[in-house]
């Protein structure tokens, strides 16, 4: 008997819920058609509608697209910085290498966090934006190419390659003009520029792609002339002649 009463109550509540839903829909339709406005009620319903439209899209964060693109991003970042540190230890020795060789700074972390936030917001609000696989694959190719160019630069230069600009000559420092350095003067910078922009194209992040390109380019546009001032001091006419023949490797930087 109690079970029958409980079932009847559930049935009545379900009927009332449907009736209330119909009444609410008809009421909102009539007020919108008649031009009546109820600011508080309208605001609440608009917020509910917007939330209801966003919440289902939260699942996009766990979709195949997000898992693939984000995993590629994390693997690219881990490999880049891990290999930088390993090569630095192998070339210069453990005692001469610090955690700065990982090339991770506060500004770099902020940029990466911003790019991830952009990705999460866009895949929730505009999931179709991330489905342009030819763009994402182009970015992946840029990441691989940039990685190869930079690592070739490090291996070719050997002990002449450091993460800090030399302001004083060293016994191990010599002018490298062979290998990848026959094509560009600063293949390490060229590789990083391609790699960093490629990570954002791989994520189909339009805002971060432009931001990364501008910020990284501006950094190298200031760094290269400063570094080459000392290279001319160290190698004189030899570097002057090399600089005239070979491009810098960074677009629009002589």
Predicted ranges, named:
Residues 177-178, 182-190:
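Histidine-centered phosphotransfer motif of kinases
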């Amino acid at each position: 008997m109690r079970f029958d009463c409980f079932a009847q109550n559930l049935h009545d509540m379900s009927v009332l819920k449907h009736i209330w839903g119909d009444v609410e829909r008809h009421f909102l339709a009539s007020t919108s058609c008649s031009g009546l406005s109820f600011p508080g009620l309208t605001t609440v319903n608009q917020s509910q509608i917007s939330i209801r439209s966003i919440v289902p899209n939260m699942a996009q964060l766990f979709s195949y697209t997000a898992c693939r693109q984000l995993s590629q991003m994390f693997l690219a970042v881990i490999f880049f910085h891990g290999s930088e540190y390993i090569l630095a230890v192998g070339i210069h020795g453990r005692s001469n290498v610090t955690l700065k060789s990982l090339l991770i700074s506060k500004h770099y972390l902020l940029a990466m966090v911003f790019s991830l936030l952009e990705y999460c917001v866009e895949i929730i609000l505009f999931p179709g934006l991330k489905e342009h696989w030819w763009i994402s694959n182009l970015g992946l190719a840029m990441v691989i190419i940039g990685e190869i160019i930079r690592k070739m630069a490090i291996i070719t230069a050997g002990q002449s390659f450091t993460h800090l600009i030399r302001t004083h000559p060293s016994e191990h420092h010599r002018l490298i003009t062979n290998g990848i350095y026959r094509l560009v003067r600063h293949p390490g910078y060229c590789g990083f520029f391609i790699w960093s922009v490629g990570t954002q194209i791989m994520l189909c992040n339009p805002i971060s792609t432009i931001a990364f390109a501008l910020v990284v380019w501006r950094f190298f546009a200031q760094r290269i002339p400063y570094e080459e001032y000392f290279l001319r001091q160290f190698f004189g006419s030899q570097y002057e002649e090399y600089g005239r023949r070979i491009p810098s490797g960074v677009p629009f930087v002589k």
